[in-house]
Amino acid sequence: TEGLNFRRAFREAGFHISGVCVWVKNSLVLGRSSYQWQHEPVLYGWLPNGKHKWFSDRKQSTVWKFDKPRRSKEHPTMKPVPLLAYPIKNSSAPNGVVMDLFGGSGSTLMACEQTDRVCRTMELDPRYASVIVMRYKAEYPDAPVHVLRDGQELSYEAVST
């Protein structure tokens, strides 16, 4: 597994690892390993000299049980919105900014909308960037949507055709 590489990268980026949470899925993720994974580790931490605030009670568990989405044609590793909403609510205040530099299918953006947070996300792959915009627009059809692409701000209509 890549667990040690992720921990090393987390530390090399200057973050303090406070712990590891575990997303327990309702089904296996088939692979080439003898034991098939039914969980994903989630590193939890913050910058050592940064402010660390907690917005929940002291009864939150490191074991997160959320159903894995069925296979998605939009994105191969789509995360369930409730999975992301859970730590977002615990780790940020309403109207706080949440950054996701790997936008994927837009689950973080959707979780932020549902929890009254502001999401700043990016996705390098144009296909997945389009998935994010279309997923958002399907859920919030009246919301104004603008996309920043190559330094230019574009309307939803310009990128959806």
What residue ranges belong to the model's regions?
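S-adenosyl-L-methionine
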Residues: 133-161
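Core catalytic lobe of class I
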Residues: 1-129
